[in-house]
Amino acid sequence: VFLKSGKAIPADMVLLSIGVRPATALAQQAGLKLGEMGGIWVDEHLETSEKDIYAVGDAIEYPHPLTGKPWLNYLANPANRQGRIVADNMVFGNTVSYEGAIGTSIAKVFDMTVASTGLAAKRLKQWGMEYQSSVTHSASHAGYYPDAMPMSIKITFDKKTGRLYGGQIVGYDGVDKRIDELALVIKHEGTIYDLMKVEQAYAPPFSSAKDPVALAGYVAEDIITGKTNPVYWRELRDIEMENKFLLDVRTPDEFSLGSLPGAVNIPLDELRDRLAELPKDKMIYTFCAVGLRGYLAYRILTQHGFDKVRNLSGGLKTYRAATAPIIIREENGNEIDESPIQKETASQTSQPN
């Protein structure tokens, strides 16, 4: 792989995530109307601009259910449903309407599973929609039962109403059923409060009493109601050290294994007795491994009169994963640090992600 910088990167596998475009040559030749995004325009019955000509599948353009904006959806599930709708409409005369698709997908990446549904933060930014997001790290089932696997969930939602916009999940086990739950709530115009009410089948080998989806809802509710004020990794990374006080509330043993540069370690259990060590004229950023203890520290500080406090969303786990250096090893053994490429890309937008 040859970069613009002139450097060459040896690789055994290259993944091209470049997207696709609808093949509409036949539709154009037939004089059918195309939409703003280049797909075949269809109405709610999936009928094109020409009477009695219908279109389904990857090439059609249809308003997104959440925004009403033109949308292209390249997924097999909606295409099959569209085929059934068109069959009914051709036989019975446009009696069935298509509701649109929010875009729910899943993929296997070696041992991991990645899944997405609805509108991610990047898309919301592109469309100028205000939103809030949260990141939670959970286990696929009860931690005391063997073989629980890590799972990370990010959701986006309306910061006022709590309406759920989208979700992304990365993990190893149980990702599929969680993304399906998020998709169902989004499709029915649900909110983060609905995530808190979802009733899942529970037994230790399959889930936790507080399921990862419910936990994501609880954290989002804390944000909306003001129980916590999150800071996101991009924000925290770009704040100059002299303007922030980094408070690591993990145990000393955890702290000894590494922390954020310049962080001060005050374990959560000692925090109430060491409040005098904290500044009140500087923003304090609390953090722990995944977010829970950082949240508890935030609550303790605000209840003791500290009004300049924010908690790192997703904790140190999220920050480290997002800011990890990109080291490329060449065939001659030289190592190249390509981290600035990551930073440049990440800083193109200033809104929290």
Q: Predicted regions: what is each one?
A:
Residues D88, F92, L184, R299-Q303:
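Short, well-ordered alpha-helices that flank and scaffold nucleotide-derived cofactor binding pockets
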Residues F2, K7-D88, V185:
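FAD-site-proximal beta/loop scaffold in flavoenzymes
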Residues G57, L247-V249:
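Active-site flanking residues adjacent to catalytic metal/cofactor-binding acidic residues
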Residues V20, E61, T161, T251, ...:
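Short, glycine/acidic-enriched loop or turn micro-motifs at the edges of active sites
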Residues Y193-P204, S208-F245, P252-Y285, A289-N353:
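Rhodanese-like catalytic fold shared by cysteine-dependent sulfurtransferases
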